[in-house]
Amino acid sequence: MEKQKIDYLEKYSIVVVGSRMMLELLWRSGIGCIRYISDFISQVDSLIDCTLDPLEANQYDIVGPRSEESNVISYLFPEDRTELKRIMKGSDIVVAHKNMLEVSKIAEEIGVPFIPDIVTTFLPDGVKFWELEYPKVERNPISYAITCGLQALEIMRTLAGQKPILAPEAILVDLKEGIKRVCLRKIGTA
């Protein structure tokens, strides 16, 4: 990408739900504002996401500012849907690795592209997240890091005006089968 387009990233606001690794990648890429909505860190989360300290397991994930120039705002995942919608409003893209169904519905309501924990983008006026059979994805540190990296690349491409991978097309990362492009099926179709 051209330097102008990369510098322009500081003008964007992205919501990240439940993935500290995505937060780190986007912050280091120069995104201007990141609203990080955290959740409870399980033992599995701390094993899969290498940006989490295993001692942080069984706690809520709170992050602070990353630098004087960055605008990282941390929230706990709210119990109230109205509050979640308020936090998400005004963002340019929403990425969720937890609470995906609820977050996808709000993203559609507020007219923002939604990216789940696989490599694809759901546009507000396109295929709906909840209408597709969601693939079973094996989670381990390597496949998770590759998935997050590919998602960050897709976000940069989208913000630079290039076409991302749009649902129902998706990329899945599996250590046994490699990186593969798939077409997600609508629920109820064979």
Where are these regions (language model features)?
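Adenine nucleotide-associated cytosolic modules
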Residues: 1-190
